[in-house]
Amino acid sequence: MTVHTLHRFDRRTLLTAGAASLLASHLPAPAWAASSGLKVTVVTGSPHRHGSSFLLTDEFIRGAKEVGAEVYRFDAAFKRVTACSGCDHCGLGAADCVYRDDMFELNPHLIDADLIVLSTPLYYFGFSAQLKLVIDRFYAINSQLHSPRKAVLLAAAWNSNDWTFPALAHHYETLVRYMGWEDVGQILGTSCGTRSQTENTEFPRLAYELGKKVCARA
């Protein structure tokens, strides 16, 4: 059970309810969030509109909007996104991708975003295939995306072992580092197998609080 905001902690410590509550309640809002009109782009990877990761996403967005953030949401599982074939026609952003699909709707919002939120169910210890399709297509706008901005990870998993989330978190953190972004929070929801199970955990509240905290206006 985890929220990781701005500070480094031991992963096992992060996977406890106490650490999650401590981080959510005691960390101050970051200074960069003081400006108004923060542009937030949320990309989800769940194929279940009423699933656990969607619940976390909804709560994060609710918190973000309450403090004035401008939120754009892209539900990848319900969009037409073709897998990157590595043809290199785009040349890392020098030309358009050969696939004319719904990524052309998403790309301007990714490029303009102050904060990018990735939301996923945990599928075999990684991103869902639907979200990974989108991430792979970052290649076509790599040069535009490779610039300072903020990032958040929201994830939900059925199981609650201490080794449940490290692989996903490492993948996300590596992506963020490569892109030159700053990780400002992770909600890693364990024991979130069904929506009703998730509703009985602290993770929806933590997602809401994180949305408010990282998107707060002065």
Tell where the protein language model's regions lie, with residue ranges:
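Short, glycine-/small-residue-rich phosphate/pyrophosphate-handling segment
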Residues: H146-G185
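N-terminal secretory signal peptides and thylakoid transit peptides that target proteins
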Residues: T2-S21
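N-terminal beta1-alpha1-beta2 submodule of the flavodoxin-like/Rossmannoid cofactor-binding fold
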Residues: T16-S119, F125-I141, Q197, T201-A218
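Residue-level recognition of alpha-helix initiation/capping sites
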Residues: T5, L55, D101, P166-A167
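A short acidic, helix-capping loop that chelates divalent metal ions and anchors anionic groups
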Residues: C192-S196
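A short, structured active-site edge motif that brings together acidic residues
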Residues: D75-K79, K150, G189
